[in-house]
Structures are given as structure tokens and as C-alpha cells.
């Protein structure tokens, strides 16, 4: 990444919540929403992905999906090894379970 950002713009009609592609984007979205007068999670829920440090420095702290990085790496290495050894490779999608880490940016109703 080169450190540049595509500016976030808020929609006219706000959804009940946002699911962001990473915690850094979720952090920036929370800041923008708060500046616009929204309360997180009372008005709008926000979740991130990757359970990065941004999830805990954000106020309120972000609910995030914790990725099993070791599991993803092991799955990739195993598929690559099978392919390099001429063995059959399963379907191109491999599911690696993760965990939802519930924090303050969402409300369980």
C-alpha cells in the first residue's frame, strides 16, 4: 500500500450497519460517522475484518472477524504441495474457519 486513501462518502439513506473489508477501513468509517453525528452502535453498527489493532484502538471498539492466518497459510501450502507433486487438487475454494470477536460497535438484539 502506498498510504493513499479513496475518500469515504456516506450514503444519503443510511443502512442499519456496515461490514467493512478490514478494521482500518472500519476505524476510518467510525470516525467519519461520529463526525457526522451518528452514534455507534445505537444508530449504526460497524464491523471490521481481520481483528487488527485498529479494532481495539477505535472508540467504540470494533466487532471484527478474526482470520485464522495460520490455517489459511497451511491450506495454501498443502494445495500448492499437492499440485507440485502432480496430485489432484480439490475444488478451488477452501473454507478456513474464523471467529467473530464481538465488541462495542455492534449490538446483539
Predicted features along the sequence, with ranges:
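Flexible loop/turn connectors
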Residues: 7-109
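Short beta-strand elements in bilobed, periplasmic/extracellular small-molecule ligand-binding domains
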Residues: 1-4
